[in-house]
């Protein structure tokens, strides 16, 4: 994951200062104001498109720290299919032992 994060950061003209991968229970990732991005190790189990969305989401926090409309506009520009990835994550959260639950 860190190599892909750095690849995406370069494509977006962003600089990540530190990357860590952890066993997080409630978050897929986080980004600090100092450029430290922390990722959940479980991302490796997810489809590449979902993983890329999470990485992109965290990278966009380097431009906009909150989840304001401006932030979501940045995410939408960088990852046009982000809604599908968010839906997948919601399904995974309901059924983490297997494939996402469908409604």
Question: Where would I find each of the regions flagged by the language model?
Answer:
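Walker B catalytic acidic pair
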Residues: 58
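Active-site-proximal or metal-binding-adjacent scaffold patches in catalytic folds
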Residues: 1-53, 62-103
């Amino acid at each position: 994951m860190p190599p892909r994060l750095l690849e995406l950061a370069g494509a977006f003209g962003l600089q990540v200062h530190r990357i860590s991968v952890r066993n997080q229970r409630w978050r897929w990732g986080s980004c600090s104001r100092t450029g430290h991005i922390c990722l959940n190790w479980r991302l490796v189990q997810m489809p590449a498109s979902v993983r890329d969305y999470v990485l992109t989401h965290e990278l966009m926090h380097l431009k906009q720290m909150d989840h304001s409309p401006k932030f979501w506009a940045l995410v939408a520009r960088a990852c046009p299919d982000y809604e599908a990835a968010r839906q997948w994550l919601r399904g995974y959260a309901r059924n983490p032992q297997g494939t996402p639950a469908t409604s």
